[in-house]
């Protein structure tokens, strides 16, 4: 009887150690997010994991642009490029008018830090059409992230 309890406790302990090791590894070995700002400071871009839990379940990443001013503006076109190749483009008409944060594209893969990412934004402000090209290359390291498996389990309840 004592021997079977010892074996059961040993198996449970090893399983717990393996789970904890995986949890720590998965939480600390995450790809970095990428960020960029326009030269005039009007726009900020971030390439990060999608926060919407339904999309996060699919391990999707999103590129969001944020308007950093209080003035009225209207987006004419947004183009997302990876290594100079257009990955997505649009006019953001599906976003609320004058939304400060706009989803540019939702990608299936995390960013590759060896690639060159740019976002070209064309907008109208005070009756004047303007264009900005934003380099998205500043790495933001993520020190600890809950693995998506754990997020999925927690979101079921």
Predicted regions and their residues:
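Hydrophobic membrane-insertion alpha-helices, especially the h-region
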Residues: 8-24
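Short, solvent-exposed, Trp/other aromatic-anchored flexible loops in extracytoplasmic proteins
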Residues: 71, 84-129, 133
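A short, sequence-level motif marking secondary-structure junctions
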Residues: 50-52, 93-97, 135-142
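Positively charged n-region of N-terminal signal peptides that target proteins for export
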Residues: 1-6
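Extracytoplasmic/periplasmic/luminal assembly and interaction segments
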Residues: 51-94
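Transition segment at domain starts
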Residues: 23-58, 142-153
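Surface-exposed edge beta-strand/loop patches
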Residues: 116-157
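A structural detector for beta-sheet-dominated domains
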Residues: 37-39, 46-48, 66-68, 76-83, ...
């Amino acid at each position: 009887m004592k021997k079977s309890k010892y074996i059961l406790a040993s198996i449970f302990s090893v399983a717990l150690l393996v789970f904890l090791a995986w949890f720590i590894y998965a939480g600390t070995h995450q790809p970095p997010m990428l960020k960029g700002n326009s030269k005039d400071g009007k726009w900020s871009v971030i390439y990060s994991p999608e926060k919407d839990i339904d999309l996060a379940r699919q391990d999707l990443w999103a590129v969001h642009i944020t308007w950093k001013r209080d003035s009225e503006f209207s987006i004419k076109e947004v183009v997302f490029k990876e290594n100079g190749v257009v990955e997505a483009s649009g006019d953001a008409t599906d976003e609320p008018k004058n939304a400060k944060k706009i989803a540019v594209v939702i990608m299936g893969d995390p960013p590759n830090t060896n690639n060159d990412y740019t976002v070209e934004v064309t907008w109208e402000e005070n009756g004047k059409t303007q264009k900005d090209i934003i380099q998205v290359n500043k790495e933001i390291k993520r020190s600890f992230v809950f693995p998506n498996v754990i997020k999925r389990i927690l979101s079921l309840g």
